[in-house]
Structure formats: C-alpha cells, structure tokens
Regions:
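Glycine-rich phosphate-binding loop and adjoining beta1-alpha1-beta2 segment
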Residues: 55-96
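N-terminal charged helix/coil linker that caps or initiates catalytic domains
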Residues: 1-33, 66
Length: 258
C-alpha cells in the first residue's frame, strides 16, 4: 500500500471538507483496482483520482478507438490507438501527480485471475462484460473477502436516475447480471435461495433496455472485455453514471474504514 499521506490543500481541500481529514488520509493510502476501463470503468477511474485515491491499478488490453467517443472518457482524437490504461495514466498525472498508477495491459482470464488478485486491494471495481470472467472474479472475491462491486450492463439505456446498487440476488432488469447470477449458482455453488444474499454487490438499472434501431445487440459473453456496449446504443449519461456509482462504493468503503 502507498504510505503517502496528502494533507488538505487547494487540490483536495474540498474532499477533506466533505469527508474529513482522516478519510482524506485513508484515500491517499488506498489502492483501488479497476478491471475494464471503457464506458464505465474510465469514469470510475476519473472519480477516484479526483477524490485523492493514492494508488490505482488499471487492467485492460484494449486501445482507444473512434467508436468509443460517445461514452468513454479517454476517447479523444489525439489518443486514438493508444492503450486505454496509458491514456488514463497520462490523464491522472494531470489530476494528481502523486497518484501511483499501475498499467496492466491484459485481460483477466480464469488462468491469470489468481495471480492478478493474489495481493489484496482496498477495493476492486469490475467493469467488464464477459459473464464467465465476471463470475470467476466474483467467486474469488467472495471467497477471499476482497471488497468489490460489479457493474451491470450500461448499454441500451437513457435514464441515469434509474440506476441503483443492490446485492446480485435482488437485481432486476439486467440480462448481463441475470446470466451472472445463473452462472454463479450453477458453476460456483452460490445459494439458490432467493431470500439469501449472494454477497455480490452490483450497480444496475431498472430501465427496460432499448434495442438498437439497426443492427444486432452484441453477446455479453463473446465481446471483448470492458463494457463495450458495442451492439446496444449507449450514452455517457448512463455509462458515466454507472462508473460514478462504482467509484462511490469504493470511496464510501474506504472512508468508513478505521
């Protein structure tokens, strides 16, 4: 863990006034991992950096593309073709030069999951759309008491006011998370009792998905990692809000630690 402690200053004074000096010190020492830094994850990273989180590990193998412009923070003309984790590291350096950023240009797989998460993080945000890998991560995190939150699908939605957080057992309206719930119960032995929490916190929306005006929606288990929303239409009004909900969960968890 990074031992640097930020004292309240012009840069993060507003955070100290809101959360308190002790919480700001905890933020500066915290290490948060974001898996998938696309339409949801990139905005989560921005929020964490602007809240004074002292160390960030970013995991993604994708590059910034022109088709990302409608929903991803780092999708700027000058950054097309650049690794997403690199584009974000460069941006974070302008926000908080003291923030340590580790770039991992890779996708999480069932083979490398244990290696990537062997070290404990203060919090992990999952913002990928591959069900099999989301399930493997969720099962691993629950087993190892790793604090985390999963993002549901953010494509095909227009109203950020309908976003909420809940345990996976309580999630509705989200095909990605419904598939995840089924997979965890079938492959990893999670309880099928609908009254019992699964200990898998999620961000999701109760909005009914709007199907594409043309083309076909992508399969959530065959698309590249990162909540690409490539098949559904997508707006940053929603994808960014999902990311901010994820970041809020991380910040509140870290602020509440003693």
């Amino acid at each position: 863990m990074n031992d640097t402690v930020f004292l309240p200053s012009r840069r993060f004074g507003g955070i100290a006034r809101l959360y308190g000096d002790e919480a700001l010190a905890r933020f500066s020492r915290a290490h948060v991992c974001v898996v998938g830094v696309g339409g949801v994850g990139s905005w989560a990273v921005e929020a964490l950096a602007r809240t004074g989180i002292g160390r960030l590990t970013l995991i993604d193998l994708d590059n910034v593309a022109e088709s990302n412009v409608n929903r991803q923070l780092h999708a700027l003309t000058d950054d097309f073709g650049k690794a997403k984790v690199t584009a974000l590291r460069e941006r974070i350096a302008q926000i908080n030069p003291q923030c340590e950023v580790e770039e991992i240009e890779d996708f999480v797989t069932e083979d490398n999951l244990e290696t990537l998460f062997r070290r404990p993080f203060d919090f992990v945000i999952d913002a990928i759309d591959q069900v099999r890998i989301k399930a493997a991560m969720a099962a691993y995190f629950v087993q190892h008491n790793q604090p985390f939150i999963l993002s549901g699908g953010a494509g095909g939605q227009k109203n950020p006011a309908l976003i909420q957080t809940a345990d996976l057992s309580r999630v509705t309206h989200d095909p990605l998370l419904a598939n995840l719930r089924y997979t965890l119960r079938k492959r990893y032995g999670f309880s099928r009792d609908t009254k019992e929490k699964m200990r898998v916190p999620c961000v999701f929306s109760t909005e009914n998905i709007t199907l594409p005006q043309s083309g076909e929606a992508c399969s959530t288990d065959t698309a590249p990692q990162g909540l690409s929303c490539a098949g559904y239409g997508a707006s940053m009004l929603v994808t960014a809000s999902f990311g901010l909900y994820c970041a809020q969960a991380a910040v509140e968890h870290i602020a509440g630690r003693k």
